[in-house]
């Protein structure tokens, strides 16, 4: 009878455990679906992070010990426990795990590097930051935290060391007790780096000192103290140097991990933008915008000491993301600069770090018009190494500006441009007719990356009025939904023709919602298949909606404008054959 009770108790316990696992999985999936706006985003997140979660069956095959071992090793925590033991015994952690016979899939760490500046973070914010770290860990991220004390004077190591110890003890208390269920597990590390001489930067002594805690689910907090081999003393060093050095070492361990995010938590927030009234740039495509933003920071709209701090953050991000792109061969690593307060916000849709882990994009689109009152003002910048951009117009071209001349000068690859348009629109371009039509009316041609996207803007006429018309806005199908690419192209389009721009789209086009958010207005007639969109600086002036009203000389007569726009857009002939041939 006693045996039966024990079996019954064990059965109930297993049912409860199974329910906990099922509920945890369901809650995680629901939160992911709630926070991601498209199926593609949810799928991309799950493809990258799903093997970070152990939601396996409770039962383990007992047919053979080998099968038990294999089953265990497909679990993240089991693999990591084995790695830790082998590291400690100075063995290769991958021997006999990923051989041809078992073909087990490696489960890499998904690392996020944080640089946390210690100025005036109150206890309430620390508690919120702790919750954000917990959420990130639950989402499959392995955080590494650099403590930034660059604001301290460098003349007294002993004083600074005592101050840092005191601050770190406070932080550990804010983050919770590791032995208590649900609290973060943390460790404080120092003197991980050595400087051999002045010519060489800091080099990490033992990467295992960081990797082993990560494999154990522990968040390492790293103090900016290094060992100077020349002087044989410990000393403080700029935290940006250590961040770069560690990132360089981690990027060499592709078989163990991937560096997903570089996050700077700084009270000054993201990189300020003149266009956005000194609130932050939403998204920065460094390949295209870096030098312009550096110049913008020097025009005097912020104090020099603040400017230098922003420049240091921007330059460090540029160096690290360039390094990551070069070493990994992709643009997967994302930079985030935000404030301690914003990191402490515990809402997946508002916290830009959590939202970016789920979607790999900012919480708002960077191409939304900053003049629109509905566009939020942010203190967070998202950065990518990004894509190169080539923009051609009459102002930067020596010869007569025609499409034929651009192709003849090998600035544009005709075949690749046609292939991009065919792929993006899912139809065959009537190449000869289309190129003949736009050849002499070309206003601007934008090519992004390796023909990943393009925009063609032409000059169209209504009577004597010359108006910029967005003729083609194309993104290769493989890149559609790629974070930031459409925004990058559309921002270039608007900056090329800020005065006045129109375009048309079929009424049934699902992209129209995106267009509505970026235009000043739109129109369509019941008998037309097109919806016409318009935007530009001219609409920041007063609009004469009633002809009888007396208005200033610069006011826009919207009735006349709509007639012109309709005449142009309805008169553009089809560019593609009716069906794919």
UniProtKB/Swiss-Prot annotation:
Residues 401-558 form the N-acetyltransferase domain. GO terms for molecular function: L-glutamate N-acetyltransferase activity. Gene3D superfamilies: 3.40.630.30. It catalyses: L-glutamate + acetyl-CoA = N-acetyl-L-glutamate + CoA + H(+). One of its GO terms (cellular component) is mitochondrial matrix. The keyword Nucleotide-binding does not apply. InterPro entries: GlcNAc_Synth_fun, Vertebrate-like_GNAT_dom. Keywords: Acyltransferase, Amino-acid biosynthesis, Mitochondrion, Transferase, Transit peptide. Its main location: mitochondrion. One of its GO terms (biological process) is ornithine biosynthetic process. Pathway: Amino-acid biosynthesis; L-arginine biosynthesis; N(2)-acetyl-L-ornithine from L-glutamate: step 1/4. Its EC number is 2.3.1.1. Belongs to the acetyltransferase family. N-acetylglutamate synthase involved in arginine biosynthesis. This is Amino-acid acetyltransferase, mitochondrial.
